[in-house]
Amino acid sequence: MRPSRSTRRHLISLLLFLFHSETACRPSGKRPCRMQAFRIWDVNQKTFYLRNNQLVAGYLQGPNAKLEERIDVVPLEPQLLFLGIQRGKLCLSCVKSGDKMKLHLEAVNITDLGKNKEQDKRFTFIRSNSGPTTTFESASCPGWFLCTALEADQPVSLTNTPDDSIVVTKFYFQEDQ
């Protein structure tokens, strides 16, 4: 019996996380972490912005366009990365709450992550590209994906049903110039 594609993907992601190479970014090691800024927007053109200390996705136009949050990234491996905002001072994390996963913003400097692999796992996301779009899966809870609601100005969250028609899990992710 062949394992499903989803099972293989989760196994590969887990192995990459557990046995990442020596060329990976190491804050206290051989190679310094390099934070990069990216623009992110979902396939419905909603961008991320901060409202009442919560990351939300909506349509920003005119003078509000300056509210768009850039996503700060520190790569661990080609597919594994830490995500943050506010110049890496607030990091996205996945925290279990009952039987669901919740997306949190934690006041942690993104360049300080990577020193404690087990503790940092909640901040780690697996980036998967499919054509022009990207998905972000939680490394600490495989099967949970970063998502936006179909409606504008709703919190960015996590879903374990990425194909559900009420959420958007595909994003355009472009390095900021």
Curated annotation (Swiss-Prot):
GO terms for molecular function: cytokine activity; interleukin-1 receptor antagonist activity; interleukin-1 receptor binding. Keywords: Disulfide bond, Glycoprotein, Secreted, Signal. One of its GO terms (biological process) is negative regulation of interleukin-1-mediated signaling pathway. Residues 1-25 form the signal peptide. Disulfide bonds join C91-C141. Glycans are attached at N109. The keyword Secreted applies. Anti-inflammatory antagonist of interleukin-1 family of proinflammatory cytokines such as interleukin-1beta/IL1B and interleukin-1alpha/IL1A. Protects from immune dysregulation and uncontrolled systemic inflammation triggered by IL1 for a range of innate stimulatory agents such as pathogens. Belongs to the IL-1 family. This is Interleukin-1 receptor antagonist protein. The gene is IL1RN.
